[in-house]
Amino acid sequence: MAKTVLRQYWDIPEGTECHRKTYATTSIGGAAGLVVSAYSVALKTPTSFLEGVARTGRYTFTAAAIGAIFGLTSCISAQVREKPDDPLNYLIGGCAGGLILGARTRSYGIGAAACAYMGLTAALVKMGQLEGWQVFAEPKV
């Protein structure tokens, strides 16, 4: 399942078709936010229906916005720098996504930490993809 979802992003060449990459990262982020919001509502039952809807929307739309900013920033960075397969593009995109999280929580500290962690994680994922690391290994039968 995760391979299929991520394939729609990885199949698009870096630095091209930014609108499709942004759509893919937005949908991946929105799906992740929906899963997190489902756990949030299930583990801490809201007092009213509207509180549950608000919490679901808050998590889902925040994660979708982070995904959209990541996809757009990393793609535009690849185009502007003319280095499509550089992990620095992903570091920039991850940092921009982290800053969105900091703005959403209205906290400079969370924004700075999320910028560093999301940027480094994204850069490591790109380095792993370039070097052939296997995140989802094929089972040996």
Curated annotation (Swiss-Prot):
It is found in: Mitochondrion inner membrane. The chain crosses the membrane at residues 22-43, 58-80. Keywords: Acetylation, Electron transport, Membrane, Mitochondrion, Mitochondrion inner membrane, Respiratory chain, Transmembrane, Transmembrane helix, Transport. Its main location: mitochondrion. One of its GO terms (biological process) is mitochondrial electron transport, NADH to ubiquinone. Disulfide bonds: none annotated. The modification N-acetylalanine is found at A2. GO terms for cellular component: mitochondrial inner membrane; mitochondrion; respiratory chain complex I. It is a multi-pass membrane protein. It holds the Pfam family Tim17. InterPro entries: NDUFA11. The keyword Mitochondrion applies. Complex I is composed of 45 different subunits. Accessory subunit of the mitochondrial membrane respiratory chain NADH dehydrogenase (Complex I), that is believed not to be involved in catalysis. Complex I functions in the transfer of electrons from NADH to the respiratory chain. The immediate electron acceptor for the enzyme is believed to be ubiquinone. Belongs to the complex I NDUFA11 subunit family. This is NADH dehydrogenase [ubiquinone] 1 alpha subcomplex subunit 11. It comes from Bos taurus. The lineage of its organism: Eukaryota, Metazoa, Chordata, Craniata, Vertebrata.
